[in-house]
């Protein structure tokens, strides 16, 4: 990556956005604080790792509604479009979810959901939501886990309840489904998403998964937080202790599918190493160039070793020194979400540089083998969230690969098969969904 272009999106810009961004329906940035207070930033560097983090959303005004351009006035076979309209079979709010008698096999039920080619109605600038939902609903590992826990889903877990209802509607409908119930409940809980203003698909995805993670948390009696002591312990022991301590407070199918574990390695000049760990839901990858860049380049930059700018006291030599910091996966996730940070919230500019991404992603060099997870780790691309246009006039849509074979475009209510596959060199790719290769 050319150094002369790194000023395009500086790391301190990202820090400013994460710390100060607050979006309403009319402004991109204001001085109001974020509605979430659990952002965890490591400000020892420009890398700004996020633990269970949220990045502010960015409003896109005047979004066109693809429902206005549906096929009802066109030839039904034109351009391989699958035109769907709303089916209310599962909209009865007075019934708890119980599909035991409907589909006897989880695998059959799973297949009917993840192979669905049914669109979602645009309720008015809700393409950001539909794009995220289609990628999540076609996430095999997650949906399979969800089906095994469906007995625990009820009105007491409203976000999970309406998400699962939506999955079932898509699996059993031949017409586009309205996500209005999920949208309504989500907006009641998060005022930022109330109404029909446009929002950011990455933030919506994080908040949605956070909600379901909290609702489906299987820990009834949480253990008190215990600070991890790493002195004299091996990496594998520290990694295990952190994970067990964390899961003593939070453990859910969302965590099992989407969360990875990061190890931060701090090295003193005397050679002493100290460790810290954190759970991550996705990897926010900064675009610091206007030139074409590869996902491998962005991951190299995310995980590169760096020097901490402030001095800390070494536990071994007792001296206050600048430490070096290295970051790797100690436990890679089953589903890896890569969030391309195309929008600079500070300058209100969108980076439209081309990004190349492989359909098979190898991340072995970003895994710490000393943590006991040294298996060869490759990921298969199965979902893409795209954003076309500008900040003030743009649109979200999804690409999803079905049966590991054919790619489909999910553009709100419109769904079509992409002949010849997708282009893995794109200036619209915004979020990439990879599943671990088994």
Where are these regions (language model features)?
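N-terminal intrinsically disordered, low-complexity regulatory segments of eukaryotic proteins
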Residues: 1-32, 36
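Residue-level signal for mature regions of secreted extracellular proteins and peptides
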Residues: 120, 261, 307-310
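Exposed substrate/partner-binding surface patches
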Residues: 5-7, 19-21, 37-42, 46-48, ...
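Intrinsically disordered, low-complexity regulatory segments in eukaryotic proteins
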Residues: 228-247
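Short, recurring structural edge motifs at helix starts
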Residues: 253-256
């Amino acid at each position: 990556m050319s150094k002369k272009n790194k000023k395009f999106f500086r790391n301190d810009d990202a820090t400013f956005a994460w710390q100060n961004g607050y979006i309403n329906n009319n402004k991109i940035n204001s001085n109001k604080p974020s509605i979430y207070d659990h952002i965890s930033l490591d400000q020892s560097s420009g890398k700004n790792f996020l633990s269970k983090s949220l990045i502010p959303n960015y409003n896109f005004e005047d979004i066109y509604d693809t429902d206005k351009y549906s096929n009802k006035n066109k030839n039904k076979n034109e351009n391989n479009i699958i035109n769907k309209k709303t089916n209310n079979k599962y909209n009865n709010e007075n019934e708890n979810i119980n599909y035991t008698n409907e589909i006897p096999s989880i695998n059959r039920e799973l297949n009917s959901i993840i192979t669905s080619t049914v669109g979602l109605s645009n309720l008015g600038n809700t393409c950001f939501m539909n794009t995220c939902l289609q990628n999540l609903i076609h996430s095999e590992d997650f949906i399979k886990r969800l089906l095994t826990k469906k007995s625990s889903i009820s009105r007491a877990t409203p976000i999970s309840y309406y998400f699962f209802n939506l999955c079932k509607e898509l699996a059993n409908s031949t017409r586009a489904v309205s996500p209005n119930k999920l949208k309504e409940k989500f907006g009641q809980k998060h005022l930022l998403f109330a109404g029909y203003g446009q929002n950011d698909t990455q933030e919506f995805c994080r908040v949605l998964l956070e909600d379901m993670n909290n609702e489906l948390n299987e820990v009834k009696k949480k253990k008190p937080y215990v600070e991890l002591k790493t002195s004299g312990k091996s990496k594998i022991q520290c990694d295990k202790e952190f994970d067990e301590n964390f899961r003593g407070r939070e453990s859910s199918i969302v965590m099992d599918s989407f969360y990875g574990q990061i190890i931060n390695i701090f090295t003193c000049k005397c050679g002493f190493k100290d460790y810290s760990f954190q759970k991550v839901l996705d990897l926010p990858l900064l675009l610091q160039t206007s030139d074409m860049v590869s996902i491998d380049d962005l991951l190299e930059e995310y995980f590169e070793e760096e020097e901490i700018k402030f001095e800390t006291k070494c536990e071994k030599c007792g001296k206050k020194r600048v430490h070096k910091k290295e970051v790797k996966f100690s436990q890679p996730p089953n589903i890896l979400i890569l969030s391309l940070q195309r929008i600079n919230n500070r300058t209100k500019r969108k980076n439209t540089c081309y990004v190349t991404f492989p359909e098979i992603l190898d991340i072995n060099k970003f895994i710490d083998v000393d943590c006991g997870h040294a298996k060869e780790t490759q990921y298969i691309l199965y979902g893409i969230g795209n954003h076309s246009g500008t900040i003030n006039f743009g649109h979200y849509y999804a690409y999803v690969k079905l049966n590991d074979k054919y790619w489909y475009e999910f553009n709100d209510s419109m769904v079509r098969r992409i002949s010849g596959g997708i282009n893995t060199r794109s200036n619209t790719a915004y979020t990439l969904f990879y599943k671990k290769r088994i």
